[in-house]
């Protein structure tokens, strides 16, 4: 029995792919720049899925964050990677998403957690609509707990207590275009 190794795509400072490395070896105190994605999932009522990272996670354990993050594999589009992670992380079906919009295509961040582990990612941010009748059943090793939040209430909580949330969520939600896209999607419901 063989286990497939999840690879992440490494990047140079210009955002060009320069190779791959096993995901298990990438996140260290000297993390190389690599490709990732970040998602904000809206249910049919226009509420945002906010997740609390599993306590067993290597980086930022137990921290509240956006709906889902991940890494596209070699030759995998972000949309395909989002669908894959929706299955692997949130227990969704591969066709659970109605719409995947890239809102912040050039988002990049570097953050260091309390243990010294670095996240350094080219990480486009996506807004995703969940189909009617779909239910989130997160895997325990990925998500400790989750909540569906009205967007403005989440924005207010992030503004008042940013230390409760992941640094990438706080930074991403400081972008007016992301907040606007989320509010427009919420108001459309």
UniProtKB/Swiss-Prot annotation:
Mg(2+) binds at residues 69, 89. It catalyses: isopentenyl diphosphate = dimethylallyl diphosphate. CDD domains: NUDIX_IPP_Isomerase. PROSITE patterns: NUDIX (PS51462). GO terms for biological process: dimethylallyl diphosphate biosynthetic process; isoprenoid biosynthetic process. SUPFAM superfamilies: Nudix. It is found in: Cytoplasm. Keywords: Cytoplasm, Isomerase, Isoprene biosynthesis, Magnesium, Manganese, Metal-binding. It is an enzyme of class 5 (isomerase). One of its GO terms (molecular function) is metal ion binding. Pathway: Isoprenoid biosynthesis; dimethylallyl diphosphate biosynthesis; dimethylallyl diphosphate from isopentenyl diphosphate: step 1/1. Its EC number is 5.3.3.2. Belongs to the IPP isomerase type 1 family. This is Isopentenyl-diphosphate Delta-isomerase.
